Amino acid sequence: MKVFESRLDIKSEQYKKRRSYLLQLLSELNLRKKQVIAQAPEAVEKLLKRGKYPAREKIRRVLDPGEEPLEIGLFAAWEMYHDIPGGYPSAGTIVQIGRVSGKLAVIVANDPLVKSGAWVEITCKKNLRAQEIAMDNRLPII
């Protein structure tokens, strides 16, 4: 097998600047991800008292043990709907791809902690995209 050698100079100033910039961008992305996923503890507690679960927890319970799902559209509705207090994180619906009984599936769950699961235009688009991904990849959708 042919070995490819890199000409990347990790000691160059250009590399160091670009690496630093990339790490800064990754840090911002991770911060935004935490903001989108964060849920008010009192709202979660209230939901649990009613015998219900947040959307990501519902999906986690359906997935095979130890399965790490791929989330689609985490940033849907990011910085949209400024007129709605709290915005519409992930467009109020969670879409993940993961294994259920050993087979890949697209799993969709409406988030009851985002405006009680109400839909807006972008929620419809996200659900249609989930169906499209499932059809294109011949995956069941749950």
What are these regions (language model features)?
Residues 1-142:
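Terminal-region recognition feature
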